[in-house]
């Protein structure tokens, strides 16, 4: 919880689809997924929801900056992991970066709010003494996203950016 944990066995080989060379190994053995979810739900979620939309958007902007700074390395990774051509990799990698930047701009435009007003005030009485407003607030919990293999960057960031901007880890 709150730290990186290595799997406790040899794991499965992740191989280059073109050469068959082993690139890495991955394992979830010995990893307490429930504890990871609890940490995200109980620590990460409240920390994100304490931030305004603009602050969450700024964090997304920093993620985008990091991805841009490492863009060339991602092409090599995309080719090794998926056999992508440079063009296929560019569509995926740049699509992911563009998606994060879009939601960062959108969130910045929402300002310092931590919830969104939905529509106008609704009168609940004959006069205006009793009114109500609908608001959209961040959900509590954890976003678990299943991603397609063909666009691992773009597909992941179109889900994660929305969740993170909304205050859901």
Where are these regions (language model features)?
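N-terminal Rossmann-like NAD(P)+-binding subdomain of aldehyde/semialdehyde dehydrogenases
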Residues: 1-126
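Conserved small-residue-rich beta-alpha loop and adjacent elements
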Residues: 117-169
């Amino acid at each position: 919880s709150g730290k990186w944990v290595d799997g406790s066995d040899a794991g499965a080989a992740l191989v280059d689809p073109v050469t068959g060379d082993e690139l890495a190994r991955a394992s979830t053995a010995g990893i307490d997924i429930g504890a990871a979810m609890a940490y995200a739900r109980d620590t990460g979620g409240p920390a994100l929801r304490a931030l305004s939309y603009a602050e969450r958007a700024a964090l997304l902007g920093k993620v985008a900056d990091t991805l841009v700074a490492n863009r060339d390395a991602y092409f090599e990774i995309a080719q090794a992991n998926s056999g992508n051509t440079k063009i296929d990799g560019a569509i995926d990698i740049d699509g992911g970066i563009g998606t994060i930047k879009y939601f960062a701009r959108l969130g910045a435009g929402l300002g310092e709010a931590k919830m969104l007003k939905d529509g106008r005030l609704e009168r609940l009485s004959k006069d205006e003494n009793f009114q109500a407003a609908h608001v959209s607030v961040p959900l509590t919990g954890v976003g678990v996203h299943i991603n397609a293999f063909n666009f691992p960057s773009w597909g992941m960031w179109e889900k994660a950016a929305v969740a993170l901007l909304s205050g859901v880890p």
